[in-house]
């Protein structure tokens, strides 16, 4: 699907871990690295497209991540002329217009799987520092990456300032009854001890 200006609607995905590093993926059979990204199908909403691409490219599902932020605007880049192809019957795609998503990985990184489809986009991945991709991505994507990471940096900074919430351990009913029973036993013991102590003191006084 290509718009009237020749740009293909696309979603881009930045996945971060708890250390603030981001997932950097190697294109299949090439010495070229980038963030996961992919086209939006006709009639598909942007968020649905993002989760579909997330699974197709890195094998993660919605439950494996937390959505932290979505870019507010479309960001565009043009393809170099050598990459612009046309067979004469289809509209010419001159570049991509993208909406970007920032996700935090919740599940174990071992769930990352680059072979969920017959034609995988990537054949390798690694964690890199937050700003590393801006310097390393191909030149025609660099301006988009710079804008995306600048927007997402503020989001991660705010996330780091939030107090950590510790989930209270769940206590089953049987455990609650055991706790209450032990508390009652302690109270009875203290009561008996006070009674014995009082009577013992009285015996001494006599």
Curated annotation (Swiss-Prot):
GO terms for molecular function: mRNA 5'-diphosphatase activity. Residues 162-206 are annotated as: Disordered. One of its GO terms (biological process) is mRNA catabolic process. It comes from the Bacteria. Its EC number is 3.6.1.-. Residues 162-191 have a biased composition (Basic and acidic residues). This is RNA pyrophosphohydrolase. It comes from Actinobacillus pleuropneumoniae serotype 3 (strain JL03).
């Amino acid at each position: 699907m290509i718009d009237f200006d020749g740009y293909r609607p696309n979603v881009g995905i930045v996945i971060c871990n708890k250390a603030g590093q981001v997932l950097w993926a190697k294109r299949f059979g090439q010495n070229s690295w980038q963030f996961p990204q992919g086209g939006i199908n006709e009639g598909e909403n942007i968020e649905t497209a993002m989760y579909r691409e997330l699974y197709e490219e890195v094998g993660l599902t919605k439950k494996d991540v937390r959505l932290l932020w979505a870019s507010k605007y479309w960001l565009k880049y043009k393809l170099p002329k050598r990459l612009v192809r046309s067979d004469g019957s289809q509209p010419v795609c001159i570049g991509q217009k993208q909406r970007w998503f920032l996700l935090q990985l919740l599940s174990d990184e071992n769930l990352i799987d680059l072979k969920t489809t017959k034609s995988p986009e990537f054949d390798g991945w690694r964690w890199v520092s937050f700003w590393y991709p801006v310097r390393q991505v191909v030149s025609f994507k660099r301006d988009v990456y710079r804008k995306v990471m600048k927007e997402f940096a503020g989001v991660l900074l705010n996330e780091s300032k939030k107090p950590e919430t510790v989930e209270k351990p769940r206590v089953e009913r049987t455990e609650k009854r055991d706790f209450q029973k032990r508390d009652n036993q302690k109270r009875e013991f203290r009561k008996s001890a006070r009674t014995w102590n009082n009577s013992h003191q009285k015996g001494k006084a006599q």
